[in-house]
């Protein structure tokens, strides 16, 4: 297996956590949020702005190697709401990081 490229910067990760203001999946407001790849590394995902969301340890462990939409359906979470919010936040973070640079 080729080594995956990971290009999520510390500034992007910090901005993602601030924008989500908690777990992207369940909304838990914790300080120990973890980087979760919506498309898992095991399935070709990478640690990038487009693929990472903050997750509480419980959601991160539950999602494990599932692709995000199948996991959201299994957990009976609002898939459309999550995906729309993820795109909005990703665009906002990308624009704010670009403005700084």
What are these regions (language model features)?
Residues 1-22, 82-98:
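Short, charged surface segments at domain edges that flank catalytic/cofactor-binding sites
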Residues 22-57, 63-75:
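Histidine-centered nuclease catalytic patch
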Residues 50, 61-101:
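A detector for short metal-coordination/catalytic motifs
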């Amino acid at each position: 297996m080729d080594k995956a490229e990971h290009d999520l910067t510390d500034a992007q990760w910090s901005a993602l956590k601030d924008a989500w203001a908690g777990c992207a999946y369940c909304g838990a407001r914790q300080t120990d949020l973890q980087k979760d790849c919506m498309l898992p590394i095991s399935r070709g995902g990478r640690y990038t702005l487009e693929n990472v969301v903050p997750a509480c340890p419980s959601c991160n462990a539950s999602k494990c190697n599932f692709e995000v939409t199948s996991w959201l359906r299994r957990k009976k979470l609002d898939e459309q709401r999550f995906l729309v919010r993820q795109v909005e936040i990703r665009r906002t973070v990308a624009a704010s990081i670009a403005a700084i640079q």
